[in-house]
C-alpha cells in the first residue's frame, strides 16, 4: 500500500513547488545543502499524506464473532499528522473504546491502522477524532464508541502564541457513550488511567 501511494503523487510538480518555495524565502535551491531538498521533501510529504484517498473504515478487514460484550479499549496509539491551517505537524496519542454489539470485535491492530489512515493527511484534530469514531461505527456497529485524542500542535509551539508542551484533547462519543454520561465517564477514567 505504501509503495502505491508514493508512486501516485506528482513528484515533478511537488519538487518544482518546493524549489520555488525555497526561492520565495530567499534561499538558493542550487546550493550544496539544498540540492536534493525538493526531492526529499516531496518524498516525505508522500509518506506524511499516505491517508489521502483512503477511508479509515476500510482498515477493519478482520471482524470476528466472540463471546465478548464488555468494553474494548486500546490506548496510547501514537500518531503524527499535519495541521491543514499551517502545514506543520501535530502529534500525540489516540485512545479508542468500543462496546461490541452481538459479539462483533476487530483485530486490535486494525484500530491503530484506522488512526494511521485518518491522521496521514492535512487534518484538524477535531475531524480526526470524529473520523476514527465514524469508521469504527460503520465497520462494527458497536453499542458504544468513544475516541479521545491528545496532541501537541507545532502551530501553537513554534509560532503565534508559542506555548510548547500545551496539549489539546478532543473526544467524540457515539451510541451508548454519547447517551449515558456515567458510561462515558467510566470509559474516560479507564482511558486516562496510568
Curated annotation (Swiss-Prot):
| Reactions that this protein is recorded to catalyse | GTP + H2O = 7,8-dihydroneopterin 3'-triphosphate + formate + H(+)
Which residues does the annotation say bind Zn(2+)?
83, 86, 155
Q: Which Gene Ontology BP annotations are present?
A: one-carbon metabolic process; tetrahydrobiopterin biosynthetic process; tetrahydrofolate biosynthetic process
Alphabetized UniProt keyword annotations: GTP-binding, Hydrolase, Metal-binding, Nucleotide-binding, One-carbon metabolism, Zinc
Q: InterPro entries from the entry?
A: GTP-CH-I_C/QueF, GTP-CH-I_N, GTP_CycHdrlase_I, GTP_CycHdrlase_I_CS, GTP_CycHdrlase_I_dom
Q: In which pathway does it act?
A: Cofactor biosynthesis; 7,8-dihydroneopterin triphosphate biosynthesis; 7,8-dihydroneopterin triphosphate from GTP: step 1/1
**Which molecular-function annotations from GO does this UniProt entry contain?**
GTP binding; GTP cyclohydrolase I activity; zinc ion binding
Can you cite an annotated GO cellular component? cytoplasm
Q: Does the keyword Metal-binding apply?
A: yes
Which EC class heads this enzyme's classification? hydrolase
EC numbers for this chain: 3.5.4.16
PROSITE patterns, per database record: GTP_CYCLOHYDROL_1_1, GTP_CYCLOHYDROL_1_2
Q: Fetch the Pfam families from UniProt.
A: GTP_cyclohydroI
NCBIfam families in the record: folE, PRK09347.1-2, PRK09347.1-3
Binding partners and assembly: Toroid-shaped homodecamer, composed of two pentamers of five dimers.
The family assignment reads: Belongs to the GTP cyclohydrolase I family.
PANTHER family with a match to the protein in the record: GTP CYCLOHYDROLASE 1, GTP CYCLOHYDROLASE I
* UniProt protein name: GTP cyclohydrolase 1
For this protein's source organism, the top of the classification is: Bacteria, Bacillati, Bacillota, Bacilli, Lactobacillales
